[in-house]
């Protein structure tokens, strides 16, 4: 493939992403033009949120069924073998960095830093969301691992050496990936909380894109280290997305029913005239 062809493919991929975002905002604008009344608008917002959570849960259930039936084992193994054949010092360094950023220590640092900021700025509902997402995500990871009891891949012995570091294989079950699930929950929730306070759509996109790259890198590091199958990582992403989305919109529902002023994570410019009853609710305020 020539450089020109690769450039065309990258441009086409970006075009697909832009069209998807434009379609999403088009749906929001259409809803804004047709939904009347504060309660109906907020109800639609919550319905969309819980619908996204159910979508993630449904995809996870479908993937779990394939894994349980052994349909993905051969493909999972081929991916790990291919990665093992294409290791490099740069790849080793990136894998170790990804493993460190997805470790419990890094996640707790991010959690405590975010908690301190939210507490000092008096965003208590956002603080509650962060902790609900973490505690529920950790519990969900343990329950799912014990439910499926999928053994870890053991393709290259009990440990692997990268840049002089001995990386031992975890002893817990493999499905889903805890690193993928908890990074999606913590970094995804933090990105959501930061992005909804950004003044422009471009800044929100950069914030969410940065979090997405970080979460993706953590998941890829688990494959590079061969401590998870690809389906484990994908399952972790889906379960983490479902739980983080459910938590976020659940907290918004509690906030609405207690204060009748939800912090809707949409920009005012993204809404049509029909959503005017909730325009004042779109600004993050101390609660």
Protein language model regions, located:
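Hydrophobic alpha-helical transmembrane segments of integral membrane proteins
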Residues: 125-156, 213-230
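Alpha-helical transmembrane segments of multipass membrane proteins
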Residues: 52-57, 137-141, 218, 243-248
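N-terminal transmembrane-helix/juxtamembrane module of multi-pass inner/ER membrane proteins
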Residues: 1-109, 146-148, 152-167, 286
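Membrane-embedded catalytic cores of phosphoryl/pyrophosphoryl-handling enzymes
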Residues: 158-285
